[in-house]
Regions:
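Juxtamembrane/disordered regions of integral membrane proteins
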Residues: 1-290
Length: 290
């Protein structure tokens, strides 16, 4: 039954967001927003009705169900990533296999440029976020370091991790935004996603073997959420500088310019609504329920 429901939810995701997904990054963002919506729709509304229980939309009930909120967000993130992967396979086999629709650069060169720009952007984002993490006392505890050398060791590990995460940003969010104003919100969303996936899930699993999705645990990590937002915005801003310069060089070819024009999001795209919904609730819910 669980897998049938998951299949149905995945099909609904594809029907609703097919036109809005342009790559891995936007698909992950829509998955995050979809997961938050499912939490409101399922555990807070439909499940009590099916169980013939009174609806309880109080903050106390939300706090009690905070763990399921994180679970739905992680589910939406994974759903969006898998959907984008399958979509890219379809595009590669049935669209870009036509010589007229091939990308101007090969897959290997695209990968190398993405991780190069992303790694540099991640380093800048890591440097920019250091003051916030240090001021809130989070930096010495990065990767579980809590010794007299924790500050130095935490900073070094933080920068290495920032470079690695920046590389993933380059791979996932390349060609998602034509301008800095449209790209930085994607960076903020990327930071929120990594806060739920990293400090709230993966890091506890690596250190202790279990994760803690209680509202109290999220409240203790709120300072790092601010750091992740700053990191995401700075990473996106830095990444867009070489990406836009490279695009200006590509647009000198009229054929590539016409193709890039078709790939731009049309006026009236729902992406700003996603930023408002996912960023607003993704940040406010841990604050209000914690």
């Amino acid at each position: 039954m669980h897998f049938l429901v998951a299949l149905l939810i995945g099909s609904i995701f594809g029907i609703l967001f097919q036109r809005d997904v342009r790559g891995y990054g936007s698909s992950m963002g829509w998955g995050l927003g979809f997961g938050i919506f499912l939490w409101f729709f399922g555990p807070l509304t439909v499940f009590p009705v099916v169980g013939r229980q009174p609806l309880d939309w109080s903050a106390e009930q939300g706090t009690a169900l905070f763990g399921s909120l994180v679970g739905y967000i992680i589910y939406g993130f994974i759903l969006g990533t898998i959907y984008a992967f399958l979509d890219r396979i379809w595009v590669r086999l049935f669209i870009q296999s036509d010589p007229l629709n091939r990308e101007p650069e090969g897959l290997g060169l695209h990968f190398l440029r993405s991780i190069e720009w992303g790694g540099l952007a991640g380093l800048v984002g890591g440097l920019v976020s250091i003051p916030v993490l240090a001021a809130t006392g989070i930096l010495p505890k990065i990767a579980g370091l809590d010794t007299s050398f924790g500050g130095i060791g935490g900073t070094i590990i933080h920068l290495f991790v920032s470079v690695g995460i920046g590389m993933t940003y380059g791979l996932l969010f390349r060609n998602e935004a034509p301008s800095i104003g449209l790209g930085v919100p994607w960076g903020f969303l990327f930071g929120v996603i990594w806060w739920y996936v990293g400090p709230l899930t993966l890091l506890p699993l690596i250190l202790t073997g279990v994760y803690d999705w209680r509202a109290s645990a999220a409240a203790a990590l709120l300072p790092s959420l601010i750091g992740h937002l700053i990191y995401g915005g700075a990473t996106a801003f830095t990444f867009l500088l070489p990406e836009r310069r490279y695009k200006r060089w590509l647009l000198l070819d009229p054929r590539i310019a016409a193709r890039e024009e078709r790939r731009l999001r049309p006026v009236g795209t729902p992406a700003p609504a996603l930023w408002f919904f996912a960023l607003g609730l993704g940040v406010l819910l841990p604050i209000l329920l914690g």
